[in-house]
Regions:
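Flexible phosphate-sensing "switch/lid" loops adjacent to ATP/NTP-binding sites
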Residues: 1-188
């Protein structure tokens, strides 16, 4: 397995780092995509890996026109370098409703080449008042008992499971990812 992260600190854990390519001022964006693809293919060959796990380098979509948050440009570049088989996405619990997850999945499938395989809902929400006043993305935490209650009432969104990252004793996300990887490895 090859794990590629954007943060330089990831190398402490043995993960590979994409920062030198993404942060390069000497390469055009198209060259960065080619370099990331070459780098990953070299790692897969060298390590005889069956799959590559890649962290999205920025928000995968723009929040609004007031507060720029990366617009998903870097994530789009990464998705061009590595055709994703699966996308596990983190969302605020207030968006963890089947209709929204289904709409996001369709959007990501068009934009990034992969639908959402699973959604992780957290008790973080966007602080819209702060966002409008300062034009800076900020968030706040909703009490866990409130968000857990809301999440427990939401079903899956068209076969897209919605997991709570708040409940640390819930093994379902790990089991879901393990099943996805088993299916992926069986296809090879």
């Amino acid at each position: 397995m090859v794990i590629l992260f954007i943060k330089k600190e990831a190398i402490i854990f043995g993960f590979k780092n994409l920062s030198p390519i993404l942060d390069s001022k000497d390469m055009a964006d198209s060259t960065k995509v080619e370099e990331m693809n070459r780098y990953a293919n070299d790692l897969v060959s060298e390590l005889n890996s069956s799959f590559v796990l890649v962290e999205a380098p920025d928000a995968v979509m723009r929040f609004n026109d007031i507060t720029p948050n990366g617009f998903g440009v870097l994530s789009y570049m990464v998705s061009q370098a590595f055709q994703p088989d699966y996308l596990i996405c983190s969302i605020p619990f207030e968006l963890a409703v089947p209709e929204m997850v289904k709409a996001l999945s369709k959007y990501f499938e068009i934009r990034l080449g992969s639908p959402i395989s699973a959604a992780l809902a957290s008790n973080i929400v966007v602080d819209s008042a702060e966002n409008l006043q300062t034009h800076v993305m900020s968030s706040l935490f909703v009490p866990m008992n409130y968000s857990m209650l809301k999440l427990s009432q939401e079903p899956c969104a068209d076969q897209i499971p919605i997991f709570s990252v708040i409940n640390e004793n819930d093994p379902r996300l790990f089991m879901h990812v393990t099943n996805l990887l088993a299916i992926h490895l069986d296809r090879r």
